[in-house]
Amino acid sequence: MKFAHPSEKLFTEHLDLFDIPWIYEPTSFPLKWGSGSIKKMFTPDFYLPSLDIYIEITTMNQKLITKKRNKIKLASKLYPNKKFKLINEKEYYNFLTQDNKILVQEAIAS
């Protein structure tokens, strides 16, 4: 499978290590409409069915983090029955250091 960023591949390898199922870019959520069409979409990087959570990973610059955080905030407001989480660089590396399934799940859910 081709990923948009190497960090996504490493993320899935760690999930696979603990048999945590994942789906890559499973769905897109409309965030803004106008003139009869969708103007803005949010496509999370992953959906983890066993935790019922959508994950967006960003290990890049602060500008992207702020933009993604705003999208997640809007998605959470528009889709209150869905759980979204942004994993920043610090959380990402913390996730990769977890060495058992429970700790991995807690790192994602926290």
Where are the regions a protein language model picked out?
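Electrostatic, structured charged patches in enzyme active sites and in nucleic-acid/phosphate-binding
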Residues: 1-110
